[in-house]
Amino acid sequence: MKAQHLFFAGMLCLAGCIAIEPTTRIEFTAPDSYPEGVAYDSIGNNYYVSSARLGSVGKVSPDGKYSVLHADTTLKSTYGMKVHPDGKRLFVLAGDANYSKYTNPATRTKMIRLIGIDLATGKRLSDLDLSALVPGKHFGNDMAFDEKGNTYITDSYAHAIYKVSPDGTASVFAKDKMFETEGIGLNGIVYHPAGFLIVDNTNTGQLYKIDIANPQNVQKVTLDQFFVGADGLLLDSPTKLTVVVNGGNDKIYQLESEDNWKSAKLSASTLIADRFTYPSTATKYRNETWIMNAKFNELVDSNGVPSKTFAIQKAVLKPLPKSKEKGKD
């Protein structure tokens, strides 16, 4: 019996000593770029990535070849991006919120622009200044499209959501006291086909549901926990939402809702062993979820050496074990 116990103990030790490898990564070389946004283009079979340091927009092939699609230092930093529903344009948010190599007092926390780029040529097709919509500081962070082609944009410093119609008309869509917080507020945003937006707040970890037809109707989504450090969002299905969390946690979570997002519960997450490095945003490749590792933790280290390589990493969400019912083994 003693020998048997020792055998099983040895097997457990061996299993514990086997290192769990991180999930698949697409590594690419783009020195000092620090990409925050990522968007997959199913037509061109490429990923597009932004740059918080250089303000450029890059293209990454599935095998990790990087090339610059659009470069303009006046953009300062580029953040959230989405391939337009027409499949021909890439919409990108540009500003000077924090990490730009080209920052200056005239634009620092003042600039917020929505750029439209031709995917075929890399040329800029549109450039919309949103800074006059709300006075004060600005940080254009993320965006979502509805089924009519309207664009909804989060401004993390102005605590507002803007709406840009297909003809380029910009307006304040929603601004509520509940959005207000210190530091980075509203961030990730998705459109739900039932006719509402879901938005997260980085500093508070709260989610909000906002009615498209009545944007004054802002509701907190009841959660079983808060997701402080919440960044990008991705709607996987009408009942499932992926939340990217960074700032020390560096994990990806999936929430599920059974009541049309009045409330939601945590249902799955990635593993610590996946070792995401300041994950920021998510995109879909077929049925898979891929995450941009922004590495922003390096930008607050004054002694750090700027990275040359970055990675888009596959998120494998593991279902959480269901809690046992009371009174049952």
Task: Walk through the language-model features, giving the residues of each.
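Beta-propeller blade signature
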Residues: 108-120, 255-258, 306-321
